[in-house]
Amino acid sequence: MAKYTFVKFKINNDFFNWEKCFYAAQPIARKAGIVEIFHGKASDDSSSGACLFHVESQEKMEAFFKDMEKEVAASGHALESTEITCYEN
């Protein structure tokens, strides 16, 4: 069964600065079984971001965020704004 995670969040700096950090973390995410399908900003609000990931498991996604919390916060991702929804098919 395929598993996906949709993450919505606020960015407290420039989207493109956040995106540089996001790209830098991708090799680590892939090793954790997390593959980005999409990331972007809201058309009418560049401080609202979203990502869609294919994940091996929700537990691996949670562990990745816990391990990378400092880096995620440093990217401008406002941790307290994070909304995570899990899907499977």
Stretches with model-predicted labels:
Residues E71-S75:
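Short, exposed beta-strand-loop hairpins at the edges of beta-sheets
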Residues M1-D67, E80-N89:
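Short S/T/G/P-rich N-terminal loop/turn motif that feeds into the first structured element of a domain
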